[in-house]
């Protein structure tokens, strides 16, 4: 019968595992996100990838996080702005008429999205028309 090894409470260093904590980080140049990576905090702190990395949370959207730990309003994406005053990642403004919510750092149209979405058999979709500042129904193909 095979028996386990007993180190009598003294685990050799070779068996001691270091807890590895990884996170998402955004590389920010001139206030704009140019890259998002997954790395250990120690690697980011070492400066091997440069100095301007800001942690971002994959599960944060509009200042909400499923576990109640939102980080920087939104998950960073390439082309997003990092606003250090708000400590937030802000997506690009989709249209000039859209307004950003200070609470969520997300953009909203000046006219709410239509509530008439049709039926399961005959759904309706809409697209924003900046020229008329209105939602227009898009033909489903």
Model-derived features: where do they sit?
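Interaction-interface detector
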Residues: 2-141
